[in-house]
């Protein structure tokens, strides 16, 4: 603690970090929240368009990877905001509330999106591992071919034109009456969302 400079510096091994004053952090946090909100709006619009394409059976890997690309950039902003919230302490409650409102449902949607399009016949996917892989990239913008590879597809540009069919997790999760086990049963018994939508009542 430097009383002369009115600063607090944290040390751990070779790591050194000087805490900022609250009056400096709040404007930065508010600006980051606005950026996060813009990302959220763009992704939500893309998900609406994706839903329309899913019902028309027109989805290609390009649409899916583009959404994931945007979400990865959004995650980086989210990580910065989480640091601001920690530094602000009780002063960061409003920022925390705004953060939760923006990211809460959207993260669930993207979780389901990954489950829908992960290229594994067994339907086994560890969401945390996928998110971990996405965080490994430090580039300003991850190439969508890289996104395709993370989802289990070949890392080639022409792969992006490949038509893909969702398993149904994302849209089925919106039906409040369906428990998680019911969704798993439907996904296991049918070959994709189109088959579920086209199924007769006695088949469901």
Label each residue range with its predicted role:
Residues 2-6, 10-17, 130, 139:
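Extended, alpha-helix-rich binding/interface surfaces that flank or overlap catalytic cores
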Residues 7, 14, 52, 59, ...:
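A generic structural signal for ordered alpha-helices
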Residues 17-90:
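Charged, amphipathic alpha-helical linkers/stalks
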Residues 30, 37-38, 42, 79-201:
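Long, highly charged, low-complexity intrinsically disordered interaction regions
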Residues 204:
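Extracellular LysM carbohydrate-binding repeats and other cell-envelope/extracellular binding modules
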């Amino acid at each position: 603690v430097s009383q002369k400079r009115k600063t607090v510096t944290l040390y751990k091994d070779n790591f050194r970090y000087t805490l900022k004053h609250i009056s400096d952090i709040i404007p930065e946090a508010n600006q980051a929240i606005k950026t996060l909100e813009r990302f959220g709006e763009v992704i939500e619009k893309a998900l609406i368009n994706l839903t329309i394409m899913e019902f028309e059976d027109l989805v290609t890997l390009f649409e899916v990877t583009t959404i994931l690309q945007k979400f990865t950039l959004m995650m980086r902003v989210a990580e910065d905001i989480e640091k601001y919230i920690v530094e602000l302490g009780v002063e960061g409650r409003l920022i925390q509330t705004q953060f939760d409102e923006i990211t809460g449902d959207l993260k669930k949607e993207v979780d389901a999106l990954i489950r829908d399009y992960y290229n594994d016949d067994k339907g086994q996917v560890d969401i945390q591992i996928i998110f971990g892989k996405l965080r490994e990239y430090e580039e300003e913008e991850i190439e969508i071919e890289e996104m395709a590879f993370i989802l289990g597809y070949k890392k080639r540009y022409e792969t992006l034109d490949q038509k893909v069919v969702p398993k149904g997790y994302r849209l089925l999760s919106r039906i409040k009456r369906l428990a998680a086990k019911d969704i798993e049963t439907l996904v296991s018994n049918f070959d994709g969302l189109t088959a579920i939508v086209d199924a007769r009542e006695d088949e469901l």
